[in-house]
Amino acid sequence: MSVDQATVRRIAHLARIKVSDEDVPHLQDELNAILRFVEELAAVDVEGVEAMTSVMPMPMKKRQDIVTEGEIPDVILANAPEREDHFFKVPKVVE
């Protein structure tokens, strides 16, 4: 599998990342290298290997479950393609 320049632009658009035309070939090469590595990993036989989340056993750090006022709608909605008042506006998908 490989990524073309149009796919790089589409990924950038979906991620809301501004990518210049001169950066597209470099990102294309990097994404293709990542995909090649993933294909190598997919070829590894892991039959009988127990699944794990970390090489070293580490307890998960938990944060306090505290209700806050938030009061940062502009920060939260900064990357929203469309918004209305203090809400994300999404296209209608169900008739």
Curated annotation (Swiss-Prot):
Role according to the record: Allows the formation of correctly charged Asn-tRNA(Asn) or Gln-tRNA(Gln) through the transamidation of misacylated Asp-tRNA(Asn) or Glu-tRNA(Gln) in organisms which lack either or both of asparaginyl-tRNA or glutaminyl-tRNA synthetases. The reaction takes place in the presence of glutamine and ATP through an activated phospho-Asp-tRNA(Asn) or phospho-Glu-tRNA(Gln).
Single Gene Ontology BP annotation: translation
Protein's UniProt name: Aspartyl/glutamyl-tRNA(Asn/Gln) amidotransferase subunit C
GO molecular function: asparaginyl-tRNA synthase (glutamine-hydrolyzing) activity; ATP binding; glutaminyl-tRNA synthase (glutamine-hydrolyzing) activity
Source species, domain of life: Bacteria
Organism: Methylocella silvestris (strain DSM 15510 / CIP 108128 / LMG 27833 / NCIMB 13906 / BL2)
Keywords annotated in UniProt: ATP-binding, Ligase, Nucleotide-binding, Protein biosynthesis
Organism lineage string: Bacteria, Pseudomonadati, Pseudomonadota, Alphaproteobacteria, Hyphomicrobiales
Family: Belongs to the GatC family.
Pfam family, one: GatC
Subunit structure of this chain's protein: Heterotrimer of A, B and C subunits.
Protein biosynthesis recorded as keyword: yes
